[in-house]
């Protein structure tokens, strides 16, 4: 693809871009600065990697204007090189698929399947399901009764969408994820567990990514809700009645207990654990392995177990490294105190 076509595309998607160099260069693929070849486009978004810019073989580099003077390579000047790189990668790596229904698929007659959608090998589509325009339902996936899949959403393979769930537009669900499984709801009577039917739904907004083997449980009574523009990594567990606010990011192995309300633009690093029946303020960030045991009322960064403001946690970590010396010092002081006490008593 000619570089000038890439420039035009970036402008079409709302990115301000200035070309410095030859717009007739052919670009075939994206690449990192180190691995790039002459027909590749790469990017620089971190000043720590400037040395890679100096030696790259990339034909084109996406960079911030402040780095323009550091290279003689043809470059595209943009405010957010990483975002521009993502859009160029989408352009050069389109996910094309045919339209139609594979012969091995089992589709109920009452389902409404858009003509532009693809229903793949061994897919099962239940009663009254709606599949929108340009959807891709990959091999082995199951969409059960009364569920809705919005247009341009992709179920890669072996994805399970249980009954009466709603998935918005332009979603991306990786293999093995389960949407709408039974919530962990049981009542105990005299030592015996009795299942509570989970009659809520899972409602997922637009442009939501759900990673490999992630699980989002349906609500017990109210819906489990994932608002638009969220990204959910592999092996995440979201329990019944949880709500995740717009634009939040959840890394691998994070677990949410039931009925927790998460605000907008929150970030959860790997293996964070979130207690049930609490609320979390907008724009809260939780470090890896944080244990969120209580409601978070103020935006900010939190770490540790139980999670506390990160600056406070860092101070505690510094102090904890000296605990052994402190214990020895206290023991020594106690000994001196006892000796002084004995001396006073003898006097």
UniProtKB/Swiss-Prot annotation:
**Which CDD domains does this UniProt record tie to the protein?**
LbH_LpxD
Active-site residue numbers: 240
The lineage's top-level taxon is Bacteria
**What are the recorded Gene Ontology BP terms?**
lipid A biosynthetic process
Q: Which GO terms describe its cellular component?
A: membrane
Keywords from the UniProt entry? Acyltransferase, Lipid A biosynthesis, Lipid biosynthesis, Lipid metabolism, Repeat, Transferase
Q: Gene3D superfamilies attached here?
A: 1.20.5.170, Hexapeptide repeat proteins, MurE/MurF, N-terminal domain
Q: InterPro entries, per this entry?
A: Hexapep, LpxD, Trimer_LpxA-like_sf, UDP_GlcNAc_AcTrfase_non-rep
Entry EC no(s): 2.3.1.191
> Pathway membership of this protein?
Bacterial outer membrane biogenesis; LPS lipid A biosynthesis
Spell out the reaction equation it catalyses. Answer: a UDP-3-O-[(3R)-3-hydroxyacyl]-alpha-D-glucosamine + a (3R)-hydroxyacyl-[ACP] = a UDP-2-N,3-O-bis[(3R)-3-hydroxyacyl]-alpha-D-glucosamine + holo-[ACP] + H(+)
An example Gene Ontology molecular-function term: N-acyltransferase activity
Q: PANTHER family, from UniProt?
A: UDP-3-O-ACYLGLUCOSAMINE N-ACYLTRANSFERASE (PTHR43378), UDP-3-O-ACYLGLUCOSAMINE N-ACYLTRANSFERASE 1, MITOCHONDRIAL-RELATED (PTHR43378:SF2)
- Family per similarity comment: Belongs to the transferase hexapeptide repeat family. LpxD subfamily.
Quaternary context = Homotrimer.
User: What is the role of this chain?
Assistant: Catalyzes the N-acylation of UDP-3-O-acylglucosamine using 3-hydroxyacyl-ACP as the acyl donor. Is involved in the biosynthesis of lipid A, a phosphorylated glycolipid that anchors the lipopolysaccharide to the outer membrane of the cell.
Indicate what this protein is called per its UniProt record. Answer: UDP-3-O-acylglucosamine N-acyltransferase
Question: Which organism's genome codes for this protein?
Answer: Hydrogenovibrio crunogenus (strain DSM 25203 / XCL-2)
**Encoding gene, per UniProt annotation:** lpxD
């Amino acid at each position: 693809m000619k570089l000038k076509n890439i420039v035009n595309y970036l402008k079409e998607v709302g990115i301000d871009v200035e070309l410095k160099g030859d717009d007739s260069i052919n670009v075939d693929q994206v690449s990192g600065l180190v691995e790039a070849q002459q027909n590749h486009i790469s990017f620089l978004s971190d000043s720590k990697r400037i040395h890679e810019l100096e030696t790259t073989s990339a034909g084109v580099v996406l960079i911030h204007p402040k780095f323009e003077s550091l290279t003689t390579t043809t470059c595209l000047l943009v405010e957010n090189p990483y975002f521009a790189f993502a859009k160029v990668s989408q352009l050069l790596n389109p996910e094309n698929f045919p339209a139609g229904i594979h012969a091995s698929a089992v589709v109920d007659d009452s389902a409404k399947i858009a003509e532009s959608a693809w229903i793949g090998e061994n897919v099962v589509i239940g009663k009254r399901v709606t599949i929108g325009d340009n959807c891709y339902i990959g091999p082995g996936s199951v969409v059960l009764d009364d569920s809705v899949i919005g247009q341009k959403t992709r179920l890669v393979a072996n994805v399970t969408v249980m009954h009466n769930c709603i998935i918005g537009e332009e979603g991306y669900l990786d293999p093995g994820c389960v949407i709408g499984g039974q919530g962990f709801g049981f009542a105990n009577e005299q030592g015996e567990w009795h299942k509570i039917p989970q009659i809520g739904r899972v409602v997922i907004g637009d442009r939501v990514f759900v990673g490999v083997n992630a699980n989002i449980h349906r609500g017990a009574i109210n819906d489990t809700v994932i608002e638009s523009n969220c990204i959910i990594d592999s092996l995440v567990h979201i329990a019944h009645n949880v709500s995740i606010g717009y634009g939040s990011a959840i890394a691998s192995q994070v677990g949410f207990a039931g009925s927790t309300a998460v605000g907008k633009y929150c970030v959860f690093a790997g293996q964070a654990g979130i207690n049930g029946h609490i609320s979390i303020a907008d724009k809260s960030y939780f470090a890896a392995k944080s244990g969120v045991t209580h409601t978070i009322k103020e935006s900010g960064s939190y770490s540790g177990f139980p999670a506390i403001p990160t600056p406070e946690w860092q101070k505690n970590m510094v102090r904890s490294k000296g605990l052994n010396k402190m214990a020895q010092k206290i023991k020594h002081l106690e000994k001196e105190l006892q000796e002084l006490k004995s001396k006073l008593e003898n006097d």
